[in-house]
UniProtKB/Swiss-Prot annotation:
The active site is at C50 (nucleophile). NADP(+) binds at G189, A190, G191, K192, M193, G194. GO terms for molecular function: glutamyl-tRNA reductase activity; NADP binding. The record marks H99 as: Important for activity. Substrate binds at T49, C50, N51, R52, S109, E114, T115, Q116, Q120. Belongs to the glutamyl-tRNA reductase family. It catalyses: (S)-4-amino-5-oxopentanoate + tRNA(Glu) + NADP(+) = L-glutamyl-tRNA(Glu) + NADPH + H(+). This is Glutamyl-tRNA reductase. InterPro entries: 4pyrrol_synth_GluRdtase, 4pyrrol_synth_GluRdtase_dimer, 4pyrrol_synth_GluRdtase_N, GluRdtase_CS, GluRdtase_dimer_dom_sf, GluRdtase_N_sf, NAD(P)-bd_dom_sf, Shikm_DH/Glu-tRNA_Rdtase. Keywords: NADP, Oxidoreductase, Porphyrin biosynthesis. The keyword Translocase does not apply.
Length: 444
């Protein structure tokens, strides 16, 4: 089995391509279910955010897995593989494990050290579990990754000076206007990104804020928290007439604001400029609007320069976290290496318990006057003897599993204890394809 990551992210692809490969939240479960049926894929988790779409997979063959995951992406988004391939980055084995740790800890984010990605990774993992797209390997790996990310943020200061994308959008507005107290700000979208933007706006002194959303009640709830006003999306054109700054993050699949709409609006704004920050992927605002004289449009990729603040300080903390990651990778690989010995240990235990059971039956035939209590006491003590006898051999088997040439040594181990290899291999298949185990996931 191999661990594989297929990634398209802000480093490798511009926003105009990333938006073509963005999974909507409502389709993630179906996407993971479909991917799980692809040849070579044994487990999978799909993560899709404004800055990345990534497929994490356990595959039985690397070459086959790579091909079918690329094909899945192309088919799902109705593109040709040749269109998708140039923008993809592939991580395998140790590189894939390291990448997952780095992403979840915020080290691979546009804003180094941000914590939003941790919640997004956890949510994607839980959805994958719900549709039975994860198994023994990813259940253990993601649990370990989420735990480490929480520890990294609590034991370092990397998150204290990190900006979110929403914060960067507000900072851009402050660079343009200075004080935001007298600015009319329009927020499109009442999701997490929109609320973070509104929270940062309020903290920066903005009080003339309007929130718009397809569901008016959500906009009203969000606006009320920060002394803003809510309006239905049907009044968008009127709201654009009043706004000085627009921050948009709706999650819509099509443009919410078109060039045609803004052309009409500009004619009624009497030459007043409108600064628009589109942090949605797919984008909410038609990029052609930037051609208009009075509209100044920035997308999520344009925020890169803004988020450089305090970067040097955060990179020092990132080095500490990378060291923590390397330690965790060693622990995970040790666990992974012993996974193959589990069926062998199980077979050894079963054989010992079978002997104990036969011994108890023989004893009951020879001493039929034994009471129930006496039987239980004898059974308990004979099982205790078995556990004591097996303790050292099991520890040795686990150590052997982590060594080079483990297969030959474990085969000798099985021969010493007269274990049938066919039974062991059958158990190995059961472990490999196990889907039922669901570990507890650390809370955020």
């Amino acid at each position: 089995m191999h661990i594989l990551v297929v990634s398209v992210n802000y480093r490798t692809a511009p926003v105009e391509f990333r938006e073509k490969l963005t999974f909507q939240a409502t389709e993630l479960e179906q996407a993971m279910t479909t991917l799980q049926k692809q040849k070579s894929v044994l487990e999978n988790v799909i993560v899709s955010t404004c800055n990345r779409t990534e497929i994490y997979a356990v595959v039985d063959q690397l070459h086959t897995g790579r091909y079918y995951i690329k094909k899945f992406l192309a088919d799902w988004f109705q593109l040709e593989i040749e269109e998708v391939a140039p923008y993809l980055t592939i991580f395998e084995q140790d590189g894939a494990i390291d990448h997952l740790f780095r992403v979840t800890c915020g080290l691979d984010s546009m804003v180094v050290g941000e914590t939003q990605i941790l919640g997004q990774i956890k949510d994607s993992f839980l959805e994958a579990q719900q549709v039975k797209a994860t198994g023994t390997i990813f259940n253990e790996l993601f649990k370990q990754v989420i735990t480490l990310a929480k520890r990294a943020h609590s034991e370092t200061t990397i998150g204290e000076s990190a900006m979110s994308v929403s914060y960067a959008a507000v900072e851009l507005g402050k660079k343009i206007f200075g004080e935001l107290t007298d600015c009319h700000v329009l927020i499109l979208g009442a999701g997490k990104m929109g609320e973070l933007a509104l929270q940062n706006l309020y903290g920066s002194g903005a009080r003339k804020v309007t929130v718009m959303n397809r569901t008016l009640s959500k906009a009203e709830i969000m606006a009320e928290k920060y002394m803003g006003h809510a309006k239905p999306l049907s009044e968008l054109q009127c709201a654009l007439l009043e706004a000085d700054i627009l921050i948009s993050s709706t999650g819509a699949s099509d443009y919410v604001i078109t060039k045609e709409m803004m052309t009409k609006v500009e004619k009624m704004r009497s030459g007043r400029p409108l600064f628009m920050v589109d942090i949605a992927v797919p984008r909410d605002i038609d990029p052609a609007i930037d051609e208009l004289e009075g509209s100044f449009l920035y997308d999520i990729d344009d925020l890169q320069g803004v988020v450089e603040a305090n970067r040097a300080e955060r990179l020092k903390e990132a080095e500490k976290i990378q060291f923590m990651i390397e330690e965790e990778i060693v622990l995970f690989k040790t666990w992974l290496s012993t996974l193959g010995v589990v069926p062998l240990i199980s077979a050894l235990r079963d054989k010992a318990l079978a002997i104990q059971s036969e011994t108890m039956e023989s004893l009951e035939r020879k001493i039929p006057t034994l009471s129930d209590r006496e039987r239980k006491v004898i059974s308990k003590h004979t099982k205790s003897i078995i556990n004591q006898l097996l303790k050292d051999p099991i520890l040795v088997a686990k150590e052997i599993a982590a060594e080079e040439g483990a297969d030959e040594k474990l085969a000798l181990f099985a021969k010493i204890f007269d274990l049938e290899m066919e039974d062991v291999e059958s158990r190995a298949e059961e472990v490999e394809h196990k889907r039922a185990w669901t570990p507890s996931v650390p809370s955020l």
